[in-house]
C-alpha cells in the first residue's frame, strides 16, 4: 500500500533489507514511478513512466515487459557488474529535464554506488530521490558492487549543493533537510 509523502507523491516500502523503496508521482490520471523494487511488491498498475535510479536487482526486478517507458542511465545499461539486472525494455535516459504534469524532474548523474547511478530532483516539491547514493543521517551507498569510492565522494559533494527539501532514498527513512 502506497503511503503519501506529499500532495501527489507516495512511497511503497516492503522489506527494506532486500527491496528498494518505490516512489510514485500521480497527476492527471498519469503515473510515474521511481524504481520498481525487487518484484515482490504488487503495485497493481503499469506506470506511464518508470525511472530507475540504478540497475541493481532490488530496484529493477519489479519492471514488467508491458511497461511502456522505462528509463535507465546509459552507462548503467552498458555495464555488466555484480547484482545488476537490466530490464529488457529499459531505454537510455536522455538525462534532460522531464515535465510530468506540473512536475519538473531534473536528473543528476551521481556515480559511485554504480557507474550509472542517478538522483532525481522534483523542482515542484523539492523532493530529491537519491536511490542508493545518499541516505538519511548522512549515510551513503556501498561502492563494492560495481561502484567507486572516489566517484561516490564527488557525487555526495554534488548532492550537498542541490537545493532540496526532502531526501527520499532507495532504502530507509526519508529525511527533511535542515535549513
What are these regions (language model features)?
Residues 19, 40-41, 55-62, 77-80, ...:
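Active-site environment of divalent metal-dependent phosphoester hydrolases
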Residues 8-15, 31-34, 49-52, 105-111, ...:
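Short, flexible loop segments at the rims of nucleotide/cofactor-binding pockets, characterized by
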Residues 1-43, 119-136:
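Conserved beta-strand hairpin/beta-sheet module of binuclear metal-dependent hydrolase folds
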Residues 33-37, 47-58, 70-74, 109-112, ...:
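Active-site neighborhood of phospho(di)ester-bond hydrolases with catalytic His/Asp-centered motifs
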Residues 15, 37-100:
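Active-site HxH/HxHxD metal-binding segment of metal-dependent hydrolases
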Residues 28-30, 43-49, 64-69, 123-126, ...:
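Short glycine/proline-enriched coil/turn segments at helix->beta-strand junctions
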Residues 87-121:
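Internal catalytic-core helix/loop-beta-alpha segment
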Residues 31, 115-179:
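Metallo-beta-lactamase
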